[in-house]
Amino acid sequence: MFSENIGNDYIVIQEGTSEGTQVKYKKDGYWYKKDNRGNEGRAEYLVSKFMQFTTLQENEFISYEEGTINGKSGCRSKNFLDEEEELVTFYRLYYNEVGKDLSKVIANMNTMEERIEYVIRFIDQSCGLNIHAYLSKVLTLDMICLNEDRHLNNLALIMRGNDF
């Protein structure tokens, strides 16, 4: 377990749609997330431990540590991005490309299958990436861990320059 005191100048402002939005910090090669409701950090830690026993490669998931941030429970992970890389959420990518709120666009579709296919097509057309395997792994893990907080601001791609 770690214990870290972090000043407000390390806070990373992230706009999101989630009710469970946690305060996030980036400091000394780590991302820190302070618990908002009490056990988010423990859940991240336990799921990352579980992932070590799956068939996924080490570069397909992030390992978390439990600890305290400014005296409050939370977790941290090593920064997995290189200096020239940026994490781009599906939400932000769609807004930048189309100028609309992707969550509102897909909310008007009748079935979950239509919503998923729409997002898959958009990513393929805008980035040239097939995300079927990625989504399959993420959504399978969500079902196993009973994650109810999957949304378009925590599904993302890594961008390096203009390439994904």
Question: What is the meaning of each model-derived region?
Answer:
Residues 114-164:
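Conserved kinase catalytic-core segment
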Residues 1-103:
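Conserved ATP-binding subdomain of kinase catalytic cores across diverse folds
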Residues 96-122:
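Amphipathic, charge-rich alpha-helical segments that serve as recognition/docking helices
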